[in-house]
From Swiss-Prot:
Name of the featured protein: Transposon Ty1-NL2 Gag-Pol polyprotein
Site residues by UniProt (Cleavage): H401, N402, N582, N583, A1211, A1212
Domain RNase H Ty1/copia-type: start-end pairs: 1604-1746
Motif mapping: Bipartite nuclear localization signal: 1172-1206
Record organism: Saccharomyces cerevisiae (strain ATCC 204508 / S288c) (Baker's yeast)
Region (Integrase-type zinc finger-like): 583-640
Amino acid sequence: MESQQLSQHSPISHGSACASVTSKEVHTNQDPLDVSASKIQEYDKASTKANSQQTTTPASSAVPENPHHASPQTAQSHSPQNGPYPQQCMMTQNQANPSDWSFYGRPSMIPYTPYQMSPMYFPPGPHSQFPQYPSSVGTPLSTPSPESGNTFTDSSSADSDMTSTKKYVRPPPMLTSPNDFLNWVKTYIKFLQNSNLGGIIPTVNGKPVRQITDDELTFLYNTFQIFAPSQFLPTWVKDILSVDYTDIMKILSKSIEKMQSDTQEANDIVTLANLQYNGSTPADAFETKVTNIIDRLNNNGIHINNKVACQLIMRGLSGEYKFLRYTRHRHLNMTVAELFLDIHAIYEEQQGSRNSKPNYRRNPSDEKNDSRSYTNTTKPKVIARNPQKTNNSKSKTARAHNVSTSNNSPSTDNDSISKSTTEPIQLNNKHDLHLGQKLTESTVNHTNHSDDELPGHLLLDSGASRTLIRSAHHIHSASSNPDINVVDAQKRNIPINAIGDLQFHFQDNTKTSIKVLHTPNIAYDLLSLNELAAVDITACFTKNVLERSDGTVLAPIVKYGDFYWVSKKYLLPSNISVPTINNVHTSESTRKYPYPFIHRMLAHANAQTIRYSLKNNTITYFNESDVDWSSAIDYQCPDCLIGKSTKHRHIKGSRLKYQNSYEPFQYLHTDIFGPVHNLPKSAPSYFISFTDETTKFRWVYPLHDRREDSILDVFTTILAFIKNQFQASVLVIQMDRGSEYTNRTLHKFLEKNGITPCYTTTADSRAHGVAERLNRTLLDDCRTQLQCSGLPNHLWFSAIEFSTIVRNSLASPKSKKSARQHAGLAGLDISTLLPFGQPVIVNDHNPNSKIHPRGIPGYALHPSRNSYGYIIYLPSLKKTVDTTNYVILQGKESRLDQFNYDALTFDEDLNRLTASYQSFIASNEIQQSDDLNFQSDIELHPEQPRNVLSKAVSPTDSTPPSTHTEDSKRVSKTNIRAPREVDPNISKSDILPSKKRSSTPQISDIESTGSGGMHRLDVPLLAPMSQSNTHESSHTSKSKDFRHSDSYSDNETNHTNVPISSTGGTNNKTVPQTSEQETEKRIIHRSPSIDTSSSESNSLHHVVPIKTSDTCPKENTEESIIADLPLPDLPPEPPTKLSDSFKELPPINSRQTNSSLGGIGDSNAYTTINSKKRSLEDNETEIKVSRDTWNTKNMRSLEPPRSKKRIHLIAAVKAVKSIKPIRTTLRYDEAITYNKDIKEKEKYIEAYHKEVNQLLKMKTWDTDKYYDRKEIDPKRVINSMFIFNRKRDGTHKARFVARGDIQHPDTYDSGMQSNTVHHYALMTSLSLALDNNYYITQLDISSAYLYADIKEELYIRPPPHLGMNDKLIRLKKSLYGLKQSGANWYETIKSYLIEQCDMEEVRGWSCVFKNSQVTICLFVDDMILFSKDLNANKKIITTLKKQYDTKIINLGESDNEIQYDILGLEIKYQRSKYMKLGMEKSLTEKLPKLNVHLNPKGKKLSAPGQPGLYIDQDELEIDEDEYKEKVHEMQKLIGLASYVGYKFRFDLLYYINTLAQHILFPSRQVLDMTYELIQFMWDTRDKQLIWHKNKPTKPDNKLVAISDASYGNQPYYKSQIGNIFLLNGKVIGGKSTKASLTCTSTTEAEIHAVSEAIPLLNNLSHLVQELNKKPIIKGLLTDSRSTISIIKSTNEEKFRNRFFGTKAMRLRDEVSGNNLYVYYIETKKNIADVMTKPLPIKTFKLLTNKWIH
C-alpha cells in the first residue's frame, strides 16, 4: 500500500519546497459542479493566506509567470485525518510549462501508475528511489479509481535553501462512450485545475475568470483531442466542432450548464442525505446551507417535511451535537427551526468557552516592549473539542484537558498538560489508518486530528509537565513505562505506550534531547515549555523564536490560530520500529484493563459483583489486579442508566412527618376501587375509600359510576361529616392521577374549599400506599366474608362496609390504639354486632294474607349507618331492609368443633353474647312501630310491593313482645346458608311476584276486599274455609310450587274436587266444588292478578289447536310448540259459564267493545267489568323525567281515542323520510388541525399514517403516473377525504374515503348491490350455536374493500400529505365510499369462500355461507364463524390468511363466559348454558351525547309510554330554521332508538315506529314523547335479551311466529300490526309497522298481520333447515279466534270483499302447503301485544320480563 511505503521514507520531504499547483481539495462526495473557476479562485486566496503565515522560499522559476495563476508558494491545507500528507504529483513543472505542451503529442511517455490515483504525487525524497510506472495514456472512464477526486496538498514548510521537486499531473481517462461525456468532462476539468489552468475554466455564467492565452488554447485543444476521440463525442459536441473545431471553451461551458441543470436536484438530495456537522463551521452557515437546499427542493416540487428534514440533519450531527439525536428523536412535532435553535445554543456555548481561554503570551502592555525571553510556568486551560460527553456531565461544550503525569513512587509530583484529547475513538478497520502509520501499530484508541492543528508542527504548551507525541518515528531509546501515570485536567487516565528521548537539531547546528512520552490518544503533539526550560531553552513570544539564555536563536515559532507551534523539521528521526513500541506498551504484565471495558464485557454488571467474582476465580484468564478500578466508584454507564432505570425508593417511615405536622382529620388519603362486573345495576360497581393520616380512621362510600358529579357528591358528604362531627377542616387530600380526581370540576371544588390536592407522581403507586393497602385489605375481607357466608356477589359492598366497621375498632400494633380511640369515639359494642351472613328471621308486619306466615328468612349484613337497626338481606324478596325486628337462628346440632361453617353462627355463645342487647330491645319493643325502613340505595327490585314484611315470628298474634327471646328458641333450622344459585346478575326486571308460600287454596270474600284486603289468585278459588287453619299451622318459610296440571278437566260444565297437597303432609285433601253462580260472582268481583306458576302448568288449557284438512297435529306437537315459549305466567282459571249479560256481548268486530289490549275474550271481559278496582300499578301515572319542557301531558298514549279525528295538517305521516344516523366521525381539521387535545391528536396522526401506509401497501392507486386535472373528464373524478373516529374498543381509526354521495351515475353499475348479512340470519345462527354448543369465532379483515379491483376508470385527488392538489391519480382498488365498492368486495370474498374454502351461500340469504362443518355470517369486513369443532374454524382462518390480512378478534375457545362485540351487539356467551345480548356500554356512551337531559338520580321509568292520550293535530307554528333544527333532532333521536330496537329491544318497536312517522311533525308533544322514550332507554340500558339453551330431550327445531294487530289506532284509521319470531323458545326478531291498507275490522287487521308473518316465517324455516339438518316444526300463534276460524273454514262465500277473501284464501294455502300449525293464544299471554299498542306498566312488564331483562 501507498501509506505503508510512505511511512518508511525519510522525513526530509518536510523541508522540500513545492510549487503550489493545487487550488482546492476535492472530496469524493463533492458536488460535481464545484469545479468552476470562481470557486477555485476563492480557494486559491485561502491557500495564499495560509501560506503567508509560514516561513517559505519562492519556488522554482520554471513556472510560467502569469498574474492570474496562484501564488507559487507552498500551499497549506488542513489534513483530513492524522498528520500532514506529502504532496503527490504526476507531472513535473517543466511538463506543465506551456512551452512544453507539445509533449502531449506523445502520450505514451507520460508516467502513470494505476494505483497511484492521487491528482498530485511527491516522491518521498531525493534519497529514495522513484518507482517505475508502466506506460499508459489513461484509464478508461468506466474504470473507477480508488481515490478519484481527492487532492492532497503539502503541509510542511520549505526552507529557503532547498529546491522544489518535480511535479507530475495525472492525465484524464479516455472517453469510451458518448453517454459518458459529461462524466468525462468532470475529470478533464480536474485535470485542467491540477495543471494550474483553473482560471480558464468557464464559470456558471459561461465566462472564464481570465482570458486564455494562445499557448493555453493549444494545450487545451491537444489534450481534448487526445483523450476525447471524435467517434465517442455526442452529437451536440460534434455540431459545435463542425462550426469551429477549436472552440473547446464553448464545449466546456455547455457541459457545465448541462451538468448543473441535470444534477442540481440530485445533488441537493445527496447533499441533504450526507450532511455532516460537528461545530467546526459556524452554525449560521450550516443553517443557511441546509435551508437553501430545502427551499430549492421545495421550489422544484420536491417537498421535504419537517420530520424528514430533522431526521436527515440529526443523522449528520457528530461530536457534542450528537446527543440531539437522542433528546429529540421522539418529538413528532419538531420543526427544523427548533432543531437549529438547539444547534445554535451548543455552538454559542462552545464559542464562549473558546473565547474565555487565557492567552499563552503576556499582555503587550505588561511587556512594555521587553524583548527578553522568559519561561512560562503557568497552567492555563486551553479549550479543545470534546467529541464525547464527559462523565460528570457538567457541560455539553468541550472543556480544557490538562494532563498530569506521575510516577508510582511517593516522590512523584503531578503537573498538567493542556490540549489533550478527552476520549479515545476506536477505529473500525484498517482503512481508518492514517498515512504514515503501519497496520501493525496500535490503533484501538486513535483519535481524529483537530481541524485547527498545524500539520508538521509541535504545539507549545506552558501548562504541560511532560512532552507527548503521537508518532513513534521521532522517539529515541524507547522503553516501557510501568511507573508512569498520565492524567488530563479531568483526572482521567491517558494510556502511555512508551517513554523515550526527543532529539532536536536546531539552526545553530546544536543537538538537544528531552524526555518524551508516546501515546496515540491526544489531539496534538505537545511540547512542554517546562522541559525546554530544563535544558536552558526558552520561548520568546515577542520575537516568536526559541532561544537559549545567551540569546542564540534556535528555531522560529509560528502562530497558527490561537496557539504557537514549532516545526518538526528540527526533530531527528529515530531508527526504532513501530512494532517495538507496540510490544512495549501492550505488555500484559504492565497494562491494566479499563473498568468501563470490563463492565461492558461482563453484561454491565456492577463493580462489586465483578470484583467479588474475580477474587473467587469464577472468571478466569485475568485477575482483579489486571483491572483499573480507579474509575469504578464514580463511573456512570449511560446504557445502564437507561436500561436499568427504576422508580425511586420509598423510605420506610418517611411519612411520619405528616403525622406530626397535621392534626386529626386534616390530611386524608383517598382512592377508588372498581369496577366489579356482572352485577345488577342496583348494586354499586365501585367504592371510594378515605383514610385519615393521623388517626387512620376509614370511610367507604358506594359508587355506581366514576363520573365527576358522583365523586363530587362523595367529597361534599365527607367534608361536611368531618366538619360537623369532628369540628375539623380538611387541609390536604392525597390521591392518584386518575381522571376522576384530576378533572376540572373537582379541582375547582377543592380550590373553593381551600383544600390542597396532593397527587402522586406518574406510575408511582407506592407513594399512595395508605389508600392502596386499605383497598387491598378491604377486598381480602370482602372475598373471605362472601366465601364464608355463601351470599351472592351483588352484596359485596355490604361485606366491605362490615369490614370497615370492624377495622376501625381494631387496635394498631404501632399506636396501640384503634382508629375510633384516636378519633375520640367509644369502642365498638360487640353485643350489637352479628357475624356477616348470620341467618335471621325478619318479621313481616304486612303479609299478603292474615293467615300467611309472618317470618321471612334473611341474612344479617352489617349495622345500619342511619339507624339503630341492622341491614338484613331477604333472598325471597331480593331486597335488603333496615330493621330491628329480627330473631337470630340458633341450633345446637352444629358445634364449632365440627367445622360446619354453615352452623358456626348457631352456637349458644352467640346468644349469650347478644343477650343484653336483645333484652334491651325486648323491653322497648312494645312502643316501637311495625314499619320497616327499606334501604333505597341497594334496593334490588323497587317494583315489588313493600307491604310484605312483618314482625318477628310468634306462635300466636297475642303473644306479648316480652317473650321474644323465649319464643325464638323454638325456631330451629339446621344448616341454613344463603342460596348460591341466586343470580348475581339479577336486576329490577328479573323480579316476578314471589313464589307461592303454600299449596293450600284461599277464599277471600268481597267484604275483605272492600276493606283493603288483597285477593290471592295464585291458588284455586274453590278451596274451603276449613283448610286455612291447617295451612297456617303446617306452613314453613319455604314451600314448593303448586302445580295445577290436573286441576281441571276439559269439560267446561262438570268439575270434580281439586286435589290439594299440603306442605309437609302425606294425605291429599280435596276441595268441594262450589256452585256455578258463586263462581261467576267471585270471578266478576275479583281484581286481575298475576301468577308466577310456570307456563308448563297452565298454558295448555288455553290453547286451541287448529287442524286443517291437510295437517292433523298431534297433542305432543301442540304442547311442544307452546312449552318453551317465554310467555307470561297466569293463574289457571276454572271453566265457567258466562252470565246472560256476557252472552249478549256484541259481535267480535264491533267497535263498541274493542279493548286496548286487542280482541274480545274472557280476560277482556273481566278487565272491563272490574276496571274500577284496578290496583295502583295499573294507573296511568308515572314519574316525570326532569326536563323543563315536559308538561302534565307528557305521559301519554300513542293511541288516540276513537272519537278524535287523527289527521295531521302536514304530509309527514304519509311519506316519512329516511332516518339520519348520528355522525360519529370527524373531519381532518376536527381531528388534527384544530384538535386541542394533544394526546388524541397524536393518536389520530398515528392512525393517519397507518392508513396511508395501508393504502400504499394495497396499491390502491397507480403510483407510476399522475394526471393533470384538465385532461380528465370531470365525471370520472371523485373527491376524497379523510374521516376519523374512535371505535368502541377505544382505538383511533382513520379512513381515506371517496365522496360517493356526489359520484356521477355513469361511473358505476346501479344494478350491483352491496350485500351484508341480514340481522335475522345472524340471530338465527347465534340461536343455533347456543343450542348445539357451537364455537363462535369473530374475525376482521383489514381494509377489506381494497382487496377488490375496480373495473371503471375513476380518478381521485391524492391525499393531502402528497401535496399535489392539481394532480389526479387513477384508482385500481375499490376505495371506501364508492358506490360499487361494497358490491365489488362482496363478489371478491364470495368467490374466494366458494372456491378456496369449499363454502356455499345459502339460497335466499346473502352473506350466509356454510359447508358441512362451518357456518359463516359476513358483514362487510366482519366474519362470524360457527362450528362444532374449533379446528374447523381454524382451518378456515388459515385459508383466509393466505389471501387477506385477517385478524382474530375472538377465537372463542374458552369454556367460560366469553364476551363479544358483534355488529354493535354486546354478547355474553357460555357454551351449553346461555347467551345474553345487550348494548349497555354503547348506550352509556351515546345517549348522553344526544343533548337530552337525562335524569340519572330520579325514579326510573317502568314503561316507555302510557295509554290514554293522543297526539294533537294542531298545526305547527314555528319558523323555518327552528323547524329544521327540530327535525334534525328527531332524526338523531329516532335514528339511535331505531338502531337499538331492531337489534334486540323489540319491546320498543311500537313506540319507535309511531314516533318515526312523526319525524316531520316535531311538535312539543312529539318531542316530549321522544324524550320519554330516550329516558326509558337510559333507565333500562342494562337490559339484555336472554337466551337459554334448548332442552336436549327435544330433537326438533321449533320456529314460531306470534302475531297481533291493533285495529284502527293509527292516523287515517290505519291499523298497527306486529309479529315476534322465536326459534326454540328464543326471541330472534320482531316487527312493528303500520298496515299498508285500511282495515275495516279487527279480524281483517289480524288477518293482515298473520299474512305479513307467514312469508318471513317460511324464509326463516328454510334458513334453519340449511344450517341445521334437524326436523323443524313451524307454528303461528294469534289471539284472534275469528282469524283462526277463517283459516280453518272451507266456506268461500262469506267474505266481505275481494281483497279480504284473497288474503284469507292465501292464508289457507300457505298454512296447508307449508305444514304450518296455527294455535290460539290468550291476549294476556300474547307477547306481540307490545308491538301494536301502548300498555300499562304492569302489563308491559308481564309480557316482556321473561325474554328481556
